C-alpha cells in the first residue's frame, strides 16, 4: 500500500501516463489523500468519515477510465471497472448490482494472494527443488526381509536385510546430493521429468456467468469441492518448467487462506475502488417502460453506494468506505437526470475537456507508454529503427483531430486507428526490409492518410 503520496505527487505520477485533465487528477488525488488522513484518525471518528464519491463527465477517449485505473494501480488498491448498462433491475434476468462488490473482493483476494506468494517464494522453490531431487532419484520400494512367514515369528534373516537397506540408503543419499549440486548449478534444466499436477477442471457452473446466478453456482461448487477429491494427472516436462509448476503448488500450500481472506476483505472494504462507466446510459426521465427499468437499476445501485452489507463467498462485505467513481459522456442526458438520491451520493463533479491538437501531440510522445514509443519498440524487434520528425507528429495529431471533428469524437482512441493505418505497410514488410533506419516525414503521413482523412465518407469506414 502506498497511501503516503501527497496530492501533488499523485498528480505528478498520473502526468506520466495521462495528458491534461488537471481537474480530474486533482479530484482523485484529494480522494486518495483523504483515505490516508482517515487512517490516522481515532476509530470512533474514522467510522463517521466516508469517502466522497466522484462523478466524471466528459466525452469518450479523454481519459476518464485511465485516471481511475492508474490511481488504483498507484496505491495498489483493489480496483474494478463495471458498466452500468450490464446490470438489470432485481427480478429481471441479468447481473445484479451486488456482483460488482463480489468482483471487487475477488480482485482483492488475487492481489493479497500474489503478495503472499512473493513472501513464500524462496521457501516454495526450495521445497520444489527437494521434490525434483526425489523425482530424479526415487527411493526404492521397501521390500519385507521375510521370505517365510515363520521368519517373522522367529526373527530369522532380518539382520542381513537391514544391512543391505542401510547400504542402499547411503548410495541414494550420495546420488541425491550430487543431483542437488547439479540442480543448483543449472546443469539439469533441460532434463525431462514426469510429475503429477492437480488438474484444472472446467466447471459446469461456468454457464451461470453473467446470469446473476454465478454466486449461487460458486457457493454450490465450493460445497462440492470440499468433499470431492482433486484430480491429478501426469505430465512430462523439462526440469525448468516442472520447477515453476511445483513452486506454484508448494506456494499455494504454504499460504494461509484464512489470513488471505481476512486481509482481502479488509482491503476491499477500506481501500476498494469501483469505477462505474456509462452511468449516463441509465439516466433519463420516465417516459416508457425501458426508462422505468433504468431507474430500477439506479435504485438498486443506491444502497450499494450509500453503504450496505453484501454477502460474498468470503463473508459479508461492508460497502460504506468503498470509493465509487462514476463516469459518463452525458451526450443525450444530464447528470440531473439521475435520481436525486443517487446524485447526492456523488458530491464531487469533474468535467473532462475535449482533446485538442496540442493534446494529441503530447499523447503521442510524452507519456511513459506513449504510442510512438510502442511502435518504435515493436519494429526494433525486426532490426528496424524508426523515428518520427516533429512535423510528422504534428501532422498525425492534426489528422486525428480533424477526423474526430468530421465523424464521431472518440478522443485519444482515434490515434490508435491512425497509427495502425499509417504503419500498416511498414509493419507488413518489416521482416523483409533491409534498411536499418526509417524516418517518418510529413510527406509520408500525407501520402498514407490525407486522401482518406479528407474524404468524410471513406474516413467513417476506415479511420
From Swiss-Prot:
GO BP: protein unfolding; proteolysis involved in protein catabolic process
Main location (coarse class): cytoplasm
Ranges for region Disordered: 154-174
Domain of life of the organism encoding this protein: Bacteria
Entries under SMART domains matching the protein: AAA (SM00382), ClpB_D2-small (SM01086)
Pfam families per UniProt: AAA, AAA_2, ClpB_D2-small
Subcellular location: Cytoplasm
Subunit details: A double ring-shaped homohexamer of HslV is capped on each side by a ring-shaped HslU homohexamer. The assembly of the HslU/HslV complex is dependent on binding of ATP.
Family of the protein in this entry: Belongs to the ClpX chaperone family. HslU subfamily.
NCBIfam families in alphabetical order: hslU, PRK05201.1
Protein name (record): ATP-dependent protease ATPase subunit HslU
Amino acid at each position: 500500500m502506498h497511501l503516503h503520496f501527497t496530492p501533488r505527487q499523485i498528480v505528478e505520477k498520473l502526468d506520466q501516463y495521462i495528458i491534461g485533465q488537471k481537474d480530474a487528477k486533482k479530484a482523485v488525488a484529494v480522494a486518495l489523500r483523504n483515505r490516508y488522513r482517515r487512517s490516522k484518525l481515532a476509530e470512533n471518528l474514522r467510522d463517521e468519515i466516508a469517502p466522497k464519491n466522484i462523478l466524471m463527465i466528459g466525452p469518450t477517449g479523454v481519459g476518464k477510465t485511465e485516471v481511475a485505473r492508474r490511481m488504483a494501480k498507484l496505491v495498489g488498491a483493489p480496483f474494478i471497472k463495471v458498466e452500468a448498462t450490464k446490470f438489470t433491475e432485481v427480478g429481471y434476468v441479468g447481473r445484479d448490482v451486488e456482483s460488482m462488490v463480489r468482483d471487487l473482493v475477488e480482485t482483492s483476494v488475487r492481489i493479497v494472494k500474489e503478495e503472499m506468494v512473493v513472501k513464500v517464494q524462496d521457501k516454495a522453490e526450495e521445497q520444489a527443488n527437494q521434490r525434483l531431487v526425489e523425482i530424479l532419484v526415487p527411493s526404492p520400494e521397501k521390500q519385507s526381509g521375510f521370505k517365510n512367514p515363520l521368519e517373522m515369528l522367529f526373527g530369522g534373516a532380518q539382520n542381513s536385510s537391514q544391512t543391505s537397506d542401510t547400504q542402499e540408503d547411503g548410495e541414494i543419499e550420495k546420488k541425491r546430493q550430487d543431483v542437488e549440486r547439479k540442480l543448483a548449478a543449472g546443469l539439469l534444466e533441460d532434463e525431462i521429468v514426469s510429475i503429477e499436477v492437480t488438474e484444472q477442471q472446467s466447471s459446469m457452473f461456468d454457464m451461470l456467468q453473467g446470469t446473476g446466478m454465478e454466486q449461487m453456482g460458486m457457493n454450490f461448487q465450493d460445497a462440492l469441492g470440499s468433499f470431492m477429491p482433486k484430480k491429478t494427472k501426469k505430465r512430462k516436462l523439462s526440469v525448468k518448467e516442472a520447477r515453476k509448476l511445483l513452486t506454484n503448488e508448494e506456494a499455494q500450500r504454504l499460504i494461509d487462506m484464512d489470513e488471505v481472506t481476512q486481509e482481502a476483505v479488509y482491503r476491499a472494504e477500506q481501500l476498494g475502488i469501483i469505477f462505474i462507466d456509462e452511468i449516463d446510459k441509465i439516466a433519463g426521465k420516465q417516459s416508457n417502460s425501458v426508462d422505468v427499468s433504468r431507474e430500477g437499476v439506479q435504485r438498486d445501485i443506491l444502497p450499494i453506494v450509500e453503504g450496505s452489507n453484501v454477502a460474498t463467498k468470503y463473508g459479508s462485505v461492508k460497502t460504506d468506505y468503498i470509493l465509487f467513481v462514476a463516469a459518463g459522456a452525458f451526450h443525450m442526458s444530464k447528470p440531473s437526470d439521475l435520481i436525486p438520491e443517487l446524485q447526492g451520493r456523488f458530491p464531487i463533479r469533474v468535467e473532462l475537456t475535449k482533446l485538442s491538437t496540442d493534446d494529441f501531440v503530447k499523447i503521442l510522445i510524452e507519456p511513459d507508454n506513449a504510442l510512438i514509443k510502442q511502435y518504435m519498440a515493436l519494429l526494433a524487434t525486426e532490426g528496424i529503427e524508426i523515428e518520427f520528425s516533429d512535423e510528422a507528429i504534428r501532422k498525425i495529431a492534426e489528422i486525428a483531430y480533424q477526423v474526430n471533428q468530421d465523424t464521431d469524437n472518440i478522443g485519444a482512441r482515434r490515434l490508435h486507428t491512425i497509427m495502425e493505418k499509417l504503419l500498416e505497410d511498414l509493419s507488413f514488410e518489416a521482416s523483409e526490409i533491409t534498411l536499418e533506419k526509417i524516418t517518418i516525414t510529413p510527406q509520408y503521413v500525407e501520402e498514407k492518410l490525407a486522401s482518406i482523412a479528407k474524404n468524410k465518407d471513406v474516413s467513417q469506414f476506415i479511420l
